[in-house]
Amino acid sequence: MTLTLLPAVDVADGLAVRLVQGEAGTETSYGDPREAALAWQRDGAEWIHLVDLDAAFGRGSNRDLIAEVVRSVDVAVELSGGIRDDDSLDAALATGAARVNIGTAALEDPEWVRKAIDRVGDRIAVGLDVRGTTLAARGWTREGGELYEVLARLDADGCARYVLTDVRRDGTLTGPNVELLRAVTAATTRPVVASGGVSSLEDLRVIATVPGVEGAIVGKALYAGAFTLPEALAVAAEVPAAGAP
């Protein structure tokens, strides 16, 4: 199998945006999120990583618009942002998203997350958003525990996969934290999706060689024109992913 690429569509105040290091106030707007998602579909994406930033930051939500984005495309969607209880989880699943990412709740409400994993299974991934080895919560504004302790607990709870983001690299075009990727994939048998810092096609080639990594989320590099999605998909196709089944 090849490395799965997930172009990102982050939504804030009804617009597709990108942040630098996940910080509110650093947004660059890229217009209608539906158009952004459809553009990635036209370019060959098989997955889209869709994030409700307002819900993640606890400052509102774009729930109806997010559902419209999911309905507007014919590809699989991984949905993230503000999924912290049964209501928000059920609403996220009801959009038709193939998979949902739980972040803050995995750190603040582990019992609920365990029950959610029992109920929904592999439609749940847990987002591990990291500074150093400390997890970040609440839209990356608070500390949320030690990475490897949380990872061991989630493995025991049956989590199917993880989305690993180095917050310090996200939106910076400075390259992925490959050392962190290798450390996390060595600590779990579950597949990992890499996120944060991808800036070049060579970065994707390197990520694909890390055992345990099945995919990569790509955001700013695409929006900034560092490479095109068809170019990235061609690279992914030529380098078999070490972590793909």
UniProtKB/Swiss-Prot annotation:
Involved pathway(s): Amino-acid biosynthesis; L-histidine biosynthesis; L-histidine from 5-phospho-alpha-D-ribose 1-diphosphate: step 4/9
Which reaction equation describes what this protein catalyses?
1-(5-phospho-beta-D-ribosyl)-5-[(5-phospho-beta-D-ribosylamino)methylideneamino]imidazole-4-carboxamide = 5-[(5-phospho-1-deoxy-D-ribulos-1-ylimino)methylamino]-1-(5-phospho-beta-D-ribosyl)imidazole-4-carboxamide
E.C. designation(s):
5.3.1.16
Q: What domain of life does the native source organism fall in? A: Bacteria
Q: Name one GO molecular function term.
A: 1-(5-phosphoribosyl)-5-[(5-phosphoribosylamino)methylideneamino]imidazole-4-carboxamide isomerase activity
Task: Please give the chief subcellular localization of this protein.
Answer: cytoplasm
Q: Name one GO biological process term.
A: L-tryptophan biosynthetic process
Name the SUPFAM superfamilies for this protein: Ribulose-phoshate binding barrel (SSF51366)
Give Gene Ontology CC terms: cytoplasm
| Pfam families in alphabetical order | His_biosynth
Q: Does the keyword Amino-acid biosynthesis apply?
A: yes
**Keyword presence, Cell wall biogenesis/degradation:** no
* Signal sequence region: none
**Entries under InterPro entries matching the protein:** Aldolase_TIM (IPR013785), His_biosynth (IPR006062), HisA/PriA_Actinobacteria (IPR010188), Isoase_HisA-like (IPR044524), Isoase_HisA-like_bact (IPR023016), RibuloseP-bd_barrel (IPR011060)
Gene3D superfamilies this protein is in?
Answer: Aldolase class I (3.20.20.70)
Tell me which family the UniProt entry assigns to this protein: Belongs to the HisA/HisF family.
Which named protein is this?
Answer: 1-(5-phosphoribosyl)-5-[(5-phosphoribosylamino)methylideneamino] imidazole-4-carboxamide isomerase
Say which species the protein is native to.
Answer: Parafrankia sp. (strain EAN1pec)
